Amino acid sequence: MAIVRHKQPPLRRFMMYWVDHARQAFSSLGELWRNPLASLMTLAVLGVSLALPSCFHVLLKNAEVVEGSWQTSSQISLYLRKDLPEQSILDMKQRILLYPEVESVTYMSRDEALKEFREISGFGDALDYLDSNPLPPVLSVIPDPRWQNPEGAAELLNKLNNEDGVEQGKLDLQWLTRLQGIMNLLRHTITGIAVLLLSAVLLIVGNTLRLNILNQRSEIEVLKLVGATDAFIHRPFLYTGIWFGVIGGMLAWWLTEVMVIWSEGVVNELAGLYNSNFRLVGMGAVDGINLILLGALLGLIASWFSVHRHIRDIEPS
């Protein structure tokens, strides 16, 4: 007598597919807790390996904040002709403000310049003997953030020097160039270290799963004997790699925030010595979630290579 098989509706098959995935995912998580010591050792190494590049990322993010404040303070000073009328100077200020490369312009008159020089120089009494004010009026120009780099600032300086009434424009380009060079070196160094550490994560997860596969060799042979598909055999190990990455990423996020909190007092004290209100910035929710997703991706990649390499070599005898 023929056996009649009822074909399941597509929606039910779709739901069962994901239920099966969820079951194997949580089963893989349970496998970690069934070997607590080995799992904790692996997760600790993964957490530290992911925490180091994330700490470097936080360092770079804070360095870029400091760089931005330093670049903003590196303004272009335009020394104008002494005989230039006040109205002409104000017209020039408004004209320069219309430049797309300019963020703000501040005007300092000759009297204001002399008063400031008197306060900071310590030659107040000597200045009283001068017949006339030797200082010119000054326009202080802050470039737009997109132009706060050596090339952009130099181009803007040349443009401003062509303004009628400008005797000389000054900008410390050498200082800007050095600052940009230091930041580029920091970015390249951190990128190189991060690549090495993330490669270590791949090796750690891959080697851990290789040992798991060898420990479960007999079970894999039985599954192959009864006709289990490769996808069914691979799936628990793939989920194990993902769990390693996710939990390692969460641990790395926590370690990074601990480092930020631990360093906060020292950084605030240093900023106070320079009369700065700078405050250390942590990872934040977006960076933390990205770190967890990165850990999951690295775990999946490492487990995929390890599973396809080692399970393929296991055949029932």
From Swiss-Prot:
Gene3D superfamilies per the record? 3.30.70.3040
Spans within the Cytoplasmic topological domain: 1-39, 210-241, 302-317
Superkingdom is Bacteria
Q: How does it sit in the membrane?
A: Multi-pass membrane protein
Chief place of localization = membrane
Q: Which keywords are on file for this protein?
A: Cell cycle, Cell division, Cell inner membrane, Cell membrane, Membrane, Transmembrane, Transmembrane helix
Q: Where are the transmembrane segments?
A: 40-60, 189-209, 242-262, 281-301
Please tell me one Gene Ontology term that the record gives under cellular component.
cell division site
Annotated GO biological processes are:
cell division
Q: Where in the cell is it found?
A: Cell inner membrane
Periplasmic-facing ranges: 61-188, 263-280
Q: What does this protein do?
A: Part of the ABC transporter FtsEX involved in cellular division. Encoded in an operon consisting of genes ftsY, ftsE and ftsX.
- Quaternary structure annotation from Swiss-Prot or TrEMBL: Forms a membrane-associated complex with FtsE.
Q: What family does the entry list?
A: Belongs to the ABC-4 integral membrane protein family. FtsX subfamily.
Designated name of the protein: Cell division protein FtsX
- Organism source for this protein? Aeromonas hydrophila
